[in-house]
């Protein structure tokens, strides 16, 4: 027998559906993701902390879940506060599957709802903007309780989540990407890169390792002096959740590294925004953000278009860029900034996710550019 569930939006909209995860309640900012696949990677992406993720593709869970496809680093954890889908298939099938999506959600205590009109929900979020919401799952639940909890959630503006989503102890990383029939590879490592962990995705670390980087991953609040004492060949700024402007410790550390050294610096997602803020620019909250694996982005220098993975609710405000920041990429959906490069330092960043997971690999050459900067600096 199915368990009822309710999704309430702060504007008063109510959706009634079926629970497919843990019973209880959860709140967060409701966003929509247009990726057709990769639901496990999305759920375990730390960038989704404090968010209720709506997947617009109607059938979610076809291929089940496994231990390998997690993006939450050494600790297998679901970071999304909740999941919202249209339909959960009765059967799951894949040679790598270890359990169903419903079993996975219950195991990780994730409150989730299915059997609602996700097209209607997506239109609301697109037109009105991302808004706070609540999922209630269980018997004897009420719309009034769900709505009250949705309106009580504080939102993401001004919220520093990077220090909460990083590994507090730091760690070393040497593992490369997964290959069919081989599993995860062990590449030859030629460079030492310190990676700031603001909520880093596992596949980012693997793609850096694929290119010869031995990674020392440090917590978000690590001072610049400690990073420089490690004598790295380059510094990486990871993705992560929350409001970048609230991460004053990260902004200060990156500013010190960029302004006082010539170390190559590469930032992704939140790391992109941190580099911009450290260089004197400002960021802004977006209407409904970019979440998906089919976002077109133009490379302004080459005039080419890339299909990218995106996951962010804040953006760099191009009108505030200082003279030493050059715009390199721009979204073809809404014209927002997607990439910058310092003109006076070997530092650059990209708003989207070149590591994909899930999504296309059109932007993978950005990792190669980072290696080129490291090679040039070592000469």
Swiss-Prot record:
InterPro entries assigned to the protein according to its UniProt record, in alphabetical order: Anth_synth/Amidotransfase, CarbamoylP_synth_ssu, CarbamoylP_synth_ssu_N, CarbP_synth_ssu_N_sf, Class_I_gatase-like, CPSase_GATase1, GATASE
GO BP annotation list: 'de novo' pyrimidine nucleobase biosynthetic process; 'de novo' UMP biosynthetic process; glutamine metabolic process; L-arginine biosynthetic process
Catalyzed reactions per annotation: hydrogencarbonate + L-glutamine + 2 ATP + H2O = carbamoyl phosphate + L-glutamate + 2 ADP + phosphate + 2 H(+)
PROSITE patterns: GATASE_TYPE_1
Domain Glutamine amidotransferase type-1, residue spans: 192-379
Annotated pathway: Amino-acid biosynthesis; L-arginine biosynthesis; carbamoyl phosphate from bicarbonate: step 1/1; Pyrimidine metabolism; UMP biosynthesis via de novo pathway; (S)-dihydroorotate from bicarbonate: step 1/3
Active site location: 269, 353, 355
Protein name: Carbamoyl phosphate synthase small chain
């Amino acid at each position: 027998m199915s368990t009822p569930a309710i999704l309430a939006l702060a504007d008063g909209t109510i959706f009634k559906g079926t629970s497919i995860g843990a019973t209880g309640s959860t709140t967060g900012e409701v966003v929509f993701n247009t990726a057709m696949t990769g639901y496990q990677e999305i759920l375990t992406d730390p960038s989704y902390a404090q968010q209720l993720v709506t997947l617009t593709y109607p059938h979610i869970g076809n291929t089940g879940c496994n231990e390998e496809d997690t993006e939450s680093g050494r600790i297998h954890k679901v970071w999304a506060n909740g999941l919202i889908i249209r339909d959960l298939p009765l059967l799951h099938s894949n040679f790598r599957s270890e359990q169903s999506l419903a079993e996975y959600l219950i195991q990780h205590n994730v409150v989730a709802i299915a059997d609602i009109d996700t097209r209607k929900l997506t239109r609301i979020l697109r037109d009105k903007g991302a808004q706070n919401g609540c999922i209630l799952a269980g018997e004897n639940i009420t719309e009034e309780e769900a709505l009250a909890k949705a309106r009580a959630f504080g939102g993401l503006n001004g919220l520093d989540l990077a220090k909460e989503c990083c590994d507090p102890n730091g760690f070393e990383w040497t593992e490369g990407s997964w290959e069919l029939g081989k599993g995860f590879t062990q590449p030859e490592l030629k460079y030492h890169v310190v990676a700031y962990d603001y909520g880093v995705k596992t596949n980012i670390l693997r793609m850096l390792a694929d290119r010869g980087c031995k990674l020392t991953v440090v917590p978000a609040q690590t001072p610049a002096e400690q990073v420089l004492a490690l004598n790295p060949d380059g510094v990486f700024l990871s993705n992560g959740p929350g409001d970048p402007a609230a991460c004053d410790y990260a902004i200060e550390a990156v500013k010190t590294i960029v302004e006082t050294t010539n170390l190559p610096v590469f930032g992704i997602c939140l790391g992109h925004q941190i580099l911009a803020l450290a260089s004197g620019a400002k960021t802004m909250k977006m209407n409904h953000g970019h979440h998906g694996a089919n976002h077109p982005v133009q490379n302004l220098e080459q005039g080419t278009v890339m299909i990218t993975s995106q996951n962010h609710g804040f953006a760099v405000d191009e009108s505030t860029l200082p003279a030493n920041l050059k715009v390199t990429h721009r979204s073809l959906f809404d014209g927002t900034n997607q990439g910058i490069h310092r003109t006076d330092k070997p530092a650059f960043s990209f708003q989207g996710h070149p590591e994909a997971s899930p999504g296309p690999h059109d932007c993978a050459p950005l990792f190669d550019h980072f290696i080129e900067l490291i090679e040039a600096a070592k000469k």
